[in-house]
Structure formats: C-alpha cells, structure tokens
C-alpha cells in the first residue's frame, strides 16, 4: 500500500513539474524566410503572430484599439493572394498532365489552401474576441484573459504550422507534376520534330531529281523570256532612232527655209544700201572734180 502511495505521489509531482516547465517555442520552417513569395508572406504573418503572443504592453494597447487585427487582416490577405498566384502559375504548367490527375491534385491543394485560410481567420477572430472580453471584463481578471489567450494562441500557431507545412508539401507535389508534365511535353515535341526532320529529308531525297528538272525548265523559260524582251528592246531602239532621224531632217529643212526667208528679207535692203552708197560715192567724186577744175580756169 505504501508503495502505491509513493508511486501516486511521484506521478503527481512529475505532472506538476511538466506543467511548470516552459513549452518549447514553435519554430517556423527556414523556407519561410527565403522561399516562394507566398512562403515569405506567411513568414511575415507568423512573425507578427509570435510578437502578438508575447502580450507585451504595446501588444495589449494595440489589441484594444483593433490595430493588431487590422494588421493581421492585411498579412492574411497578402498570404492568400500569393498562394493563389503561385497555384495559378503551376496550373499553367500542367498542360500535358492527365485531366483526372490534374483535377485530383487541384482538389487536394484547394482543400489545404482553405485550411490555412481558416487557421489565419480563426487567429484574427480569437484576437477580436479577446478585445471584446477585455473591454467587457465580465467577472474575469485581465490576467486570466491573457493566460487563456496565450494558451489558445499556442494551439492556433501549432495548427497553423501543421496546415502550412501540408500546403507546402502539396504545392511541391503540384510543382513536381508540372515539371514532369513539362518534361514529357518537351520530349514529345522533340520526338515530333525529329520525325518531321526525317520526313523532310526523305521527301527531299525523293523529289530532288524532279526539282532539278523543273529548275532547268524554268531556267530555259527565263532565258527565252529574256531574249524576247531583248529583241523587243532592240526593235524599240531602232524605231526611236528612225524617229530621231526624221525629226532632225525636219528641223534641218525648217532651218534652211528660215534662212532663205531671212535672205529674201535682207537682200533687197542690202542692194538698196549698195546703190545708195554708189550714188553717194559718185556724187562725192563729181564734187571733188568740180572743185579741182575751178582753180585751173582762174590761172
């Protein structure tokens, strides 16, 4: 009997010791500090919640004026927005994956995403409830309310961490499926291109002789066409040369006619001037003879 009482006392003391030992801090994964944008956003939410859990004087003050809940709302919305953006990015890379596999992965991922959102929503609601309780103080001390809130926040942080890691794993599976599908798509494209190249080579080998013959025929037609055009050009050049000769002959004829007309105009005038000049010279000569004859008679 004494042995049973001793065991009971030891058990009770061990339980009390376990209760007073501080609970280990829940640590966030290292990837939340340098991972995808949604992980970075979740890390900011986690760090802010860890600061709130200290329940310092500043936290108490901001809890009472709803600043904490407002900040958590912004961080929560940023996190869920980044999760949706990353999920959409992965969905665009799931083209070659089977539709049933894609639907199953998408459904599981959507459920994990909803659980994470519900966890963050519960954290915000619990803090809002604490603010209301502190303002009402219905038969409870502030110390009791803070202790109960701290305990509840520890549980919520554990649940948040668990659901966040679950979402992280499912996103990793989703991404692996996208990469595998993309690799299969690239392999299929490579095989298709190889087949097309081989078909092109075979077609070129089969059609090389007819192509050569068609090229020769085309060259002959082109040569004949060039000769025809050259003959037409030479004929046209001869025609232009004849027209130029005709024009030159007409211009020479017109020049001769104009010269004859000018000659007809000026010859009478020149003849009249010559006659007048002869008359003038003759008159001068007569006058000179008359003047030389007069002195001789006086002697």
UniProtKB/Swiss-Prot annotation:
Keyword set, alphabetical order: Chylomicron, Endosome, Extracellular matrix, Glycoprotein, HDL, Heparin-binding, Lipid transport, Lipid-binding, Oxidation, Phosphoprotein, Repeat, Secreted, Signal, Transport, VLDL
Positions bearing Phosphoserine: 141
Segments of this protein annotated with the region Specificity for association with VLDL: 261-273
Post-translation changes: APOE exists as multiple glycosylated and sialylated glycoforms within cells and in plasma. The extent of glycosylation and sialylation are tissue and context specific.
Modification type Methionine sulfoxide: residues: 137
GO molecular function: cholesterol transfer activity; heparin binding; phosphatidylcholine-sterol O-acyltransferase activator activity; phospholipid binding
Repeat region (Sequence), residues: 74-95, 96-117, 118-139, 140-161, 162-183, 184-205, 224-245
Record InterPro entries: ApoA_E, Apolipoprotein_A1/A4/E
Gene3D superfamilies: Apolipoprotein
Amino acids binding heparin: 156-159, 219-226
Region (LDL and other lipoprotein receptors binding): 152-162
Biological processes per GO annotation: acylglycerol homeostasis; cholesterol efflux; cholesterol metabolic process; lipoprotein metabolic process; melanosome organization; phospholipid efflux
Record flagged with keyword Metal-binding: no
Region (Lipid-binding and lipoprotein association): 204-273
Main localization (coarse): secreted
Gene Ontology cellular component annotations, sorted alphabetically: chylomicron; extracellular exosome; high-density lipoprotein particle; low-density lipoprotein particle; multivesicular body, internal vesicle; very-low-density lipoprotein particle
Residues spanning the signal sequence: 1-18
UniProt key word Magnesium: no
Compartment list: Secreted; Secreted, Extracellular space; Secreted, Extracellular space, Extracellular matrix; Extracellular vesicle
A Pfam family assignment: Apolipoprotein
The protein's assembly and partners: Homotetramer. May interact with ABCA1; functionally associated with ABCA1 in the biogenesis of HDLs. May interact with APP/A4 amyloid-beta peptide; the interaction is extremely stable in vitro but its physiological significance is unclear. May interact with MAPT. May interact with MAP2. In the cerebrospinal fluid, interacts with secreted SORL1. Interacts with PMEL; this allows the loading of PMEL luminal fragment on ILVs to induce fibril nucleation.
Function: APOE is an apolipoprotein, a protein associating with lipid particles, that mainly functions in lipoprotein-mediated lipid transport between organs via the plasma and interstitial fluids. APOE is a core component of plasma lipoproteins and is involved in their production, conversion and clearance. Apolipoproteins are amphipathic molecules that interact both with lipids of the lipoprotein particle core and the aqueous environment of the plasma.
Family according to the record: Belongs to the apolipoprotein A1/A4/E family.
Protein's recorded name: Apolipoprotein E
Phylogenetic classification of the source organism: Eukaryota, Metazoa, Chordata, Craniata, Vertebrata
